Structures are given as structure tokens and as C-alpha cells.
Amino acid sequence: MSKNTEKAIPVWEKYSLNVPEAAEYYGIGEKRLRQIANENEGADFILKVGSHIRFKRKMFEDYLNETNTI
């Protein structure tokens, strides 16, 4: 399938989000998301694909629900 005919998966159905997607979805800046990833290296909600950071959506939501300050 070409990109024009592919059906886009809604963000709320994706397993993981890249930094720009997560920033838009959660309303948190990209810089802060990268800091969170660096501060929580090895956390269950972080997925590293090569040098790229992805956030496991449901697990990151659980993390946010338990956090008082970002």
C-alpha cells in the first residue's frame, strides 16, 4: 500500500507513540518528554527503537496517573 491509500491508525489506538505524537496527545512538550525518558531510562513505559524514543501509551498513562508533578 502506498502512503496515500494506507489507513491511519488513530493515536488513541496505537500501542506506542513517538515524541511528537506523545507531545500532542498528552499536552506535554517534546523537550520535557525527552527529559522524562532520560530520567526514567529502563522504565516499562519507554520503548527504544534504535536511537528513537517511543512511549508505550497505556503504561505511560498509568505513570502519569500516579504522578503529581511533571
Where are these regions (language model features)?
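Polyanion-binding surface elements
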Residues: T5-R32
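Short, Lys/Arg-enriched charge-dense amphipathic segments
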Residues: W12-K14, T67-I70
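Residue-level recognition of hydrophobic positions within alpha-helical transmembrane segments
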Residues: L17, R57-K58
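Major-groove DNA-recognition helix of helix-turn-helix-type DNA-binding domains
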Residues: E24-R54, E61, T67-N68
